[in-house]
């Protein structure tokens, strides 16, 4: 039997986290290949329905990552994201998903090392949770 490798969808801010991911790549830092980056202009633009859809389509974990509070290119986008993620974590169990499968982080543009570390940590955390229930239902 194959070892479970989780699928992680990461919504990343164009101005900070995506730049950190690029820096990690150019610095030849490694992070798991099962993390799929979706670049958004700001984490404040990530609608909760995109996160729920990612889970319903079989993602084992979702990351939303952007600029540190106070450093948002769009002034308050990361504050909006923080409020949305907090509310979404409260309702995820109603959809049958463990709230530990959703994570919000702040990664600055020059934090390539931190980006790679967070990706590895997230994959390890989600791997310990096992496959998402939506994915198990799709197989049946």
Language model: regions and residue ranges:
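Iron-sulfur-associated redox domains of electron-transfer enzymes in respiratory
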Residues: 1-140
């Amino acid at each position: 039997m194959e070892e479970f490798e989780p699928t992680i969808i990461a919504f990343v801010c164009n101005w900070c986290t995506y730049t950190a991911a690029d820096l990690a790549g150019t610095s030849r830092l490694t992070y798991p290949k099962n993390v799929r980056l979706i670049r958004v202009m700001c984490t404040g633009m990530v609608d909760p329905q995109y996160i729920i859809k990612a889970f319903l389509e079989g993602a084992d974990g979702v990351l939303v990552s952007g600029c540190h509070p106070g450093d948002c290119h769009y002034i308050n986008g990361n504050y909006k994201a923080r409020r949305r993620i907090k509310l979404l974590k409260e309702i995820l169990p109603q959809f049958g998903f463990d709230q530990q499968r959703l994570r919000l982080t702040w990664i600055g543009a020059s934090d390539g090392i931190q980006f790679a570390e967070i990706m590895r940590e997230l994959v390890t955390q989600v791997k310990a949770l096992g496959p998402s229930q939506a994915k198990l239902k799709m197989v049946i």
